[in-house]
């Protein structure tokens, strides 16, 4: 009788553990809907190529795996020149350099001490935040001015516009090159193409490369979180980040 009880107890524990493992676990990354809104804002505020680059590269999956984000978006013209004049590893490294795995609103950036160091999604590279001593309003990252702060301010994501591209070599260390460019070239994500195999549905859906910009007829002001959300949602069904239609 004792053996039967022990076996039954073991089976109950095993089945309980199996059920727990099979249950869906809540995601710890940024909400998909919030990232959609941020991408929509980038498109109508002169940063469409940065938005295209996010959804047509494996950077999208890196962004979705972080609990919070700050995106520092360069202008379309800057990113277009980069795409035309530099190699694939250099291009992708630059995208990662503009992504910080922390949510930093404008007030959050202003509260940081001068010469603060910010982590990025580019391995072994951090951004140096500096401020002019005469004014707390002028913020620079690796020497590039924060030109349009607060493009998007969500609960998990903040987006700011830059005056230029962030350099892959920090101004204070001109000889410190990015170490992972060669490693990126050997990554199975690329295989001689700008696009990784995983995000191919997004590229097929948009029919755009990062260097192609969709036309924007009207530029809208940046809304605060929760105001006018319906105007900036890419779309729960059929949008570029629609998990059901695009293989999420």
Swiss-Prot record:
Keywords: Glycoprotein, Proteoglycan, Secreted, Signal. It comes from the Eukaryota. InterPro entries: FAS1_dom_sf (IPR036378), FAS1_domain (IPR000782), Fasciclin-like_AGP (IPR052806). It comes from Arabidopsis thaliana. This is Fasciclin-like arabinogalactan protein 19. PROSITE patterns: FAS1 (PS50213). Residues 1-29 form the signal peptide. Glycans are attached at residues 114, 136. Coiled coil: none annotated. It is found in: Secreted. Residues 213-248 are annotated as: Disordered. SUPFAM superfamilies: FAS1 domain. Belongs to the fasciclin-like AGP family. May be a cell surface adhesion protein.
């Amino acid at each position: 009788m004792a053996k039967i009880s022990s076996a039954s107890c073991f089976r109950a524990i095993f089945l309980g553990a199996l059920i727990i493992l099979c249950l869906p676990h809540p995601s710890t990354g940024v909400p998909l809907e919030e990232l959609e809104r941020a991408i929509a804002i980038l498109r109508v505020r002169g940063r469409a190529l940065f938005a295209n680059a996010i959804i047509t590269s494996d950077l999208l999956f890196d962004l979705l795996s972080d609990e919070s984000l700050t995106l520092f978006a360069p202008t379309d013209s800057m990113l277009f020149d980069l795409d035309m004049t530099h190699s694939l590893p250099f291009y992708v490294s630059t995208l990662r350099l503009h992504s910080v795995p922390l949510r930093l609103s404008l007030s959050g950036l202003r509260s940081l001490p001068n010469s603060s160091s910010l982590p990025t999604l580019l391995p072994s590279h951090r951004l140096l935040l500096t401020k002019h001593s005469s004014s707390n309003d002028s913020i620079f990252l690796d020497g590039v001015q924060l030109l349009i702060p607060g493009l998007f301010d969500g609960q998990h994501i903040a987006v700011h516009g830059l005056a230029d591209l962030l350099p892959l070599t920090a101004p204070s260390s001109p000889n410190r090159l990015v170490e992972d460019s060669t490693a990126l070239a050997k990554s199975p994500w690329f295989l001689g193409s700008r696009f990784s195999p995983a995000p191919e549905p997004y590229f097929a859906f948009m029919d755009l490369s990062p260097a192609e910009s969709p036309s924007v007829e009207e530029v809208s002001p940046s809304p605060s979180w929760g105001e006018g959300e319906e105007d900036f949602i890419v779309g729960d069904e059929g949008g570029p980040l629609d998990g059901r239609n695009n293989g999420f």
